A protein has these predicted regions:
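A short, Lys/Arg-rich alpha-helix, primarily the initiator
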Residues: 1-23
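Residue-level marker of alpha-helix boundaries and capping positions
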Residues: 8, 19, 29, 47-48
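Short basic helix-loop element that most often maps to the first helix and adjoining turn
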Residues: 15-34, 59
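Key DNA-contact positions within bacterial/archaeal DNA-binding proteins
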Residues: 29, 40, 69
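Recognition helix of helix-turn-helix/homeodomain-like DNA-binding domains
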Residues: 36-51
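Short, basic-rich loop-to-helix N-cap that marks the start of a DNA-contacting helix
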Residues: 49-62
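Short C-terminal boundary/hinge segments that cap the last helix of small helical domains
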Residues: 54, 64-71
Length: 71
């Protein structure tokens, strides 16, 4: 039986994404359209710390110029 692994707390990264988006004056709808995700998915990433797929994380940090090195 496998042990349940501790999951990374993604809330700090989500907050950094939200701050970068707002700094650039972009709405969730605009970002969602740009990277082809539902704005509700972005809301969950930003506010609830939902873990995005690797591709979505890459798209967000590339678009918004967020460095994830500090996390």
């Amino acid at each position: 039986m496998r042990k349940k692994e501790d999951k990374y707390d993604f809330r700090a990264v989500g907050l950094a994404i939200k701050e970068a988006r707002m700094k650039r004056g972009l709405t969730r709808e605009q970002v969602g359209t740009m990277i082809e995700i539902d704005p509700r998915y972005l809301t969950n990433i930003e506010n609830k710390g939902q873990h995005p797929s690797t591709q979505v994380l890459y798209d967000l940090v590339s678009l918004l110029h967020v460095s994830i090195d500090e996390f």
